[in-house]
Amino acid sequence: ITPIAKDAFVFFVNKDNTIENLTLEQIQQIYSGKIKNWRNVEGPNIEIIAYQCPTNSFTQAGMLKLVMKDKMMTPPQDSLNSSNGNIVDVISQYVNQNNSIAYSYLYNANTMYKNENIKFLSINGVAPTYDNVKNGLYNLQTTYYAVVKKGVQENSNVSKLLNEIKNEKGQEIVREAGYVQNY
């Protein structure tokens, strides 16, 4: 098992929402139904619409593992009716509501379907920037791995490919593709 790239789990709101930062605890409270109004997190006096992804999605699994941990989520007010590969529909459904919050992986939200009408929130005062993810300052992140069968020979094509992914050129391709370099 070899780490090859990183990605951040991000929260986003409409660009006109005044909120810039939330703590992990505030996000857990929003998604567990304990915080229901933006005024409770120093925002405007308006109800929060907390979108959730489908229960069988990779993104929802990330939400449960990285963010909610052992805390229960409330049933969704609104669900992002999308598979992981169709997040553009999610964002287009979401954009025009200033009181909404949603989540995704940075790669999906920022690279595949970049949308100028959303902004990413800082979590615990740390923005989900490339450098903050690479340096481990932004904590909500995942690592992608290459899994190779044990006993693969050093001069095999598999080993050569893995070495190419790990070298400077390979990691630059990782970055150009929209992920965060691991090395």
PLM region descriptions:
Residues 1-183:
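Exported/periplasmic ABC-transporter solute-binding proteins
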